[in-house]
C-alpha cells in the first residue's frame, strides 16, 4: 500500500518540476495550439498556447511508475499509456510542426490504436492469466462473487479493442476545456486504485496512483487560464493507461460507469452527427457536451468543476458496484 502513495507523490513532484522546464521550450519551439473558428468565441484568445504538454505528466507518471512498480501488470498499464501517448505525439507533431491541420490520417491513428488494444488483450489473457470473462457490476448484490460472463477469445478480443478505442478517443474528446480532462482523469484513476486492489493487482493500483499524481501536477499548469495544453499526446495516453487498468482488473464495465463523463462526451458527438445527418437538426448547441454548456452561458470553470463533481458521483456509483464481487 505504501508504494501506491509513493508512486503518487513521486509522479506529482516530477510533474511539478518538469512543467516550468518544458513549457518555455514548447513556447520557444512555437508548438502552439490552433483554435477552431467555429467554437466558442472566447476560446480564440487561447490560440498559440503551447500544446503537447502531455509529455510533462507522462514524465512524472513514468518516474513514479517505473521506479516503484515491479509487477508485469503494472508495467503493461504504463506501457499502454506511453504507447497511446506516442500515437498522440505523432498526431500533435504533424499538426503543430508539419502544419498538416488534421494530423495523422484517421486510418493511421485507428490502426495504431487497434494494434495496441489487441496486444493488450492477448497479453492479459495468455500472459497474465486474466481469462476471457467480464464481470457484471452490481451482480454481487445478487450472489457473492458476482456474475461473470465468459466471452471466449475472439469475442473478448473484439470487445477489448472496441472498448479501448472508444474510451481512449472519448478521453480525447473530453480534453476541450482548461483542466477538464486532467481533473476528470485524476479522479477516475484514483477510483481505479481500490478496484485494482480488490482484484489483487497492486502493480496496477500503483500505476493508477502515478497517473493520478501526474494529472494533479499537470493541473497546476492546465487549470484556467491554462499555460499549456496536454494535446493528443496527453489525452490518448490517459485513455490508454486507464483502459489498460480496466482490462487487466476485469473492471471494463465498472470503468464505463466510473468514466461516465467520457461516455457522455463521446455519445454527445455521436448523437449530434447522426441527428444532423438524418434530420438536418442539432440536438446540442455544440458537441462535445462541455461546449453545449459553454454556449448556454456557463463559464469555463463552472463547466469543469461541475464535470469534476459528476465524476465523483460516477466514481462512487462504480465503486458501489464492487460490492461482494471479491
Swiss-Prot record:
<keyword id="KW-0132">Cell division</keyword>
<feature type="transmembrane region" description="Helical">
    <location>
        <begin position="109"/>
        <end position="129"/>
    </location>
</feature>
<comment type="similarity">
    <text>Belongs to the glycosyltransferase 4 family. MraY subfamily.</text>
</comment>
<keyword id="KW-0812">Transmembrane</keyword>
<dbReference type="InterPro" id="IPR018480">
    <property type="entry name" value="PNAcMuramoyl-5peptid_Trfase_CS"/>
</dbReference>
<dbReference type="InterPro" id="IPR000715">
    <property type="entry name" value="Glycosyl_transferase_4"/>
</dbReference>
<dbReference type="GO" id="GO:0071555">
    <property type="term" value="P:cell wall organization"/>
</dbReference>
<keyword id="KW-0573">Peptidoglycan synthesis</keyword>
<keyword id="KW-0133">Cell shape</keyword>
<dbReference type="GO" id="GO:0051301">
    <property type="term" value="P:cell division"/>
</dbReference>
<dbReference type="Pfam" id="PF00953">
    <property type="entry name" value="Glycos_transf_4"/>
</dbReference>
<feature type="transmembrane region" description="Helical">
    <location>
        <begin position="228"/>
        <end position="248"/>
    </location>
</feature>
<feature type="transmembrane region" description="Helical">
    <location>
        <begin position="4"/>
        <end position="24"/>
    </location>
</feature>
<comment type="pathway">
    <text>Cell wall biogenesis; peptidoglycan biosynthesis.</text>
</comment>
<keyword id="KW-0131">Cell cycle</keyword>
<dbReference type="GO" id="GO:0008963">
    <property type="term" value="F:phospho-N-acetylmuramoyl-pentapeptide-transferase activity"/>
</dbReference>
<keyword id="KW-1133">Transmembrane helix</keyword>
<feature type="transmembrane region" description="Helical">
    <location>
        <begin position="203"/>
        <end position="223"/>
    </location>
</feature>
<keyword id="KW-0472">Membrane</keyword>
<dbReference type="GO" id="GO:0008360">
    <property type="term" value="P:regulation of cell shape"/>
</dbReference>
<dbReference type="GO" id="GO:0005886">
    <property type="term" value="C:plasma membrane"/>
</dbReference>
<feature type="transmembrane region" description="Helical">
    <location>
        <begin position="74"/>
        <end position="94"/>
    </location>
</feature>
<feature type="transmembrane region" description="Helical">
    <location>
        <begin position="254"/>
        <end position="274"/>
    </location>
</feature>
<keyword id="KW-0808">Transferase</keyword>
<comment type="function">
    <text>Catalyzes the initial step of the lipid cycle reactions in the biosynthesis of the cell wall peptidoglycan: transfers peptidoglycan precursor phospho-MurNAc-pentapeptide from UDP-MurNAc-pentapeptide onto the lipid carrier undecaprenyl phosphate, yielding undecaprenyl-pyrophosphoryl-MurNAc-pentapeptide, known as lipid I.</text>
</comment>
<feature type="transmembrane region" description="Helical">
    <location>
        <begin position="49"/>
        <end position="69"/>
    </location>
</feature>
<keyword id="KW-0479">Metal-binding</keyword>
<feature type="transmembrane region" description="Helical">
    <location>
        <begin position="151"/>
        <end position="171"/>
    </location>
</feature>
<dbReference type="GO" id="GO:0046872">
    <property type="term" value="F:metal ion binding"/>
</dbReference>
<feature type="transmembrane region" description="Helical">
    <location>
        <begin position="179"/>
        <end position="199"/>
    </location>
</feature>
<dbReference type="GO" id="GO:0051992">
    <property type="term" value="F:UDP-N-acetylmuramoyl-L-alanyl-D-glutamyl-meso-2,6-diaminopimelyl-D-alanyl-D-alanine:undecaprenyl-phosphate transferase activity"/>
</dbReference>
<feature type="transmembrane region" description="Helical">
    <location>
        <begin position="303"/>
        <end position="323"/>
    </location>
</feature>
<keyword id="KW-0961">Cell wall biogenesis/degradation</keyword>
<dbReference type="Pfam" id="PF10555">
    <property type="entry name" value="MraY_sig1"/>
</dbReference>
<protein>
    <recommendedName>
        <fullName>Phospho-N-acetylmuramoyl-pentapeptide-transferase</fullName>
        <ecNumber>2.7.8.13</ecNumber>
    </recommendedName>
</protein>
<dbReference type="GO" id="GO:0009252">
    <property type="term" value="P:peptidoglycan biosynthetic process"/>
</dbReference>
<keyword id="KW-1003">Cell membrane</keyword>
<dbReference type="InterPro" id="IPR003524">
    <property type="entry name" value="PNAcMuramoyl-5peptid_Trfase"/>
</dbReference>
<keyword id="KW-0460">Magnesium</keyword>
